[in-house]
């Protein structure tokens, strides 16, 4: 009986194991992957359509670095092909409106009706990950994962 109890406890413990993905490593590899894909505006617009789950934030400042996998847990970003979007948290719509892809000479960003802090910065897309790269202007970088 003790043996079965031990096996049961071990199985439950393993099923509750913490996420083993190192999101800081994912972010560090995003730029080279994004650059390799050489997105055009129409291709990127079509590729971005879908539902994304927020995964990670990292930022740097005078006080050191900050990173979290829990600040926006449960937040989802939905980018629809009809150029509408919504950001939901805990099954509640926090933001919604229209989106478009803004293209500068070397990068892309989302142009939104409403300002959403987790969507600021350059878009760096390497499926299934979508990063909003805001650290060049001392903001946080947010990472989403496509479902």
Name the predicted role of every residue range:
Residues 12-15:
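C-terminal motif of bacterial Sec signal peptides marking the signal peptidase cleavage site
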Residues 1-4:
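Positively charged n-region of N-terminal signal peptides that target proteins for export
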Residues 6-10:
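Hydrophobic alpha-helical targeting segments used for export or membrane insertion
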Residues 17-94, 107-147:
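Lipid interaction determinants
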